Amino acid sequence: MGGTLKILMDRILTGAIREGRFDVIWPDGSSSRYGNGETPAAAVHIRNQAALRRMVINPGLAVGEAYMDEGLVPLNCSIHEVLTVLLQNIRHGGVPVIEWNLKLARILRPFIQANNAVRAKHNVAHHYDLNGRLYSLFLDRDRQYSCAYFPRGDETLEEAQAAKKRHIAAKLRLDRPDLTVLDIGSGWGGMALTLAKDFGARVTGITLSEEQLAEARARAAASGLSDRVNFELMDYRAVTQQYDRIVSVGMFEHVGVPNYPTYFETIKRCLKPDGVALLHAIGRFDGPSATNEWIAKYIFPGGYSPALSEVLAPLEKSGLISADIEILRLHYAKTLAHWRRRFAANRDAIAAIYDERFCRMFEFYLSGSELAFRLNNHMIFQIQIVRDQEAVPLTRDYMFEQERSTTFAAAAD
């Protein structure tokens, strides 16, 4: 059986690895080399037959699991280098077992993404209710757990996250104090606190994470902003009040395609007639697909990064208007590279909170996600949404003017 598994994996790698070099030491101690180049290069040891069997059957899930369980070990390189070789090659297709599993995942997608209120809260808790200290060890000081914005390209993480908030605020057109803002998926409160402190807004932030809620409320109190910012444990579907502005950053990925009509109907119901909303989310260039099985199992259950075509149809059907759309291409790759380096620098402290297997899981997640944006057709889209065409000026000049004129601290402690 072991010989058969080796033959099958050899066929997969021979067909897949066309660029760079990939070396494998098999469970029996023999070795093979794949590819016809020198870079990128990586080498691994597949240490046991169980890991090999799982990777032959379902590599999209099993490669990550094998790394977590030390059934697959990088040799004189990092998992980031291993994934660089693999993803640079399989992005061109030609791996039948991966394509078959992807087709099956697409068929099952409506059931996997049926994120009702109960399931949505459970899914959020899976990732966002982890020990809060973990995130402080690799995020910026403001705990912005979403794509930063690099207008120059050489910003620090703190500078880029501040630029992201400034960029979004400009699109919200916060042109007067005391505008009411709904922040859907408010996280640890950084966006809401910035909009209140620097733009005089009155913000309601909603989240399904109890850990994030407690931290956000504590930050509001410590900043003296509790009279302007209110955080609630609430599903977006339960909101009834109307707001001047609505912002949602990094939350839409958890909604699920079957719930997009409800999401946009909620935006329309809760946005005042002359209001402005801004949706910031991960998307994909290559059309509708399915979430990687490993990511769905270990990181974001129920999560999905849609094609823009999947988003615009239900938005238009709701009667809302897309006033402005911007695609941010490599900004998240740069953000994730910062997170990956910070995680590596604090790995011992993180292992003390959890364990080595958890660290390998997170390393795989951060590296795989970064490479998805560099090599695998992922991007960020920002959609400015209105109910009335006259809610914003005729040209984008007002965004640039406000963004240039706005200065605030890179991060709020």
Residue map of PLM features:
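Feature captures hydrophobic
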Residues: 1-155, 159-161, 167, 174
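Conserved SAM-binding loop of SAM-dependent methyltransferases across substrates and taxa
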Residues: 188-199
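Conserved SAM-binding loop
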Residues: 216-217
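A short acidic, Gly/Pro-enriched loop at the edge of an enzyme's catalytic core
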Residues: 237-246
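A short glycine-rich, Lys/Arg-flanked "PGG" loop and its adjoining helix->strand segment in the class I
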Residues: 261-274
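Conserved beta-strand signature within the Rossmann-like core of class I S-adenosyl-L-methionine
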Residues: 274-282
